[in-house]
Amino acid sequence: MFDQTTQPEAHQLTVGKIETANGTIKPQLLRDAVKRAVTNFFAQMDGQEAEEVYEMVLCEVEAPLLDIIMQHTRGNQTRAANMLGINRGTLRKKLKKYGMN
């Protein structure tokens, strides 16, 4: 699903490839996809005040991330926590939050 670009100085997640106006194919960065999604969200709000945008975006990204990591580690929470760089207790709380326990 996600690829990492081959730039050694910065491992950036990509969500696919896009063709530029001049026909060049380049990676589509996850960061850019999130930026577009949030921009579209605000456009749809039509001037209304938005609340809890941080939590909304975090949930949209965090839940599939946890799901993929748990699949990759075959449910091993210690390995998953190490891969994510978080405490195992924190991982357990997040899994419970998204109903993945």
Curated annotation (Swiss-Prot):
The keyword Transcription applies. The keyword DNA-binding applies. GO terms for molecular function: DNA-binding transcription factor activity; sequence-specific DNA binding. Keywords: Activator, DNA-binding, Transcription, Transcription regulation. SUPFAM superfamilies: Homeodomain-like. Pfam families: HTH_8 (PF02954). InterPro entries: Fis_DNA-bd, Homeodomain-like_sf, HTH_Fis, Trans_regulatory_Fis. Homodimer. NCBIfam families: PRK00430.1. This is DNA-binding protein Fis.
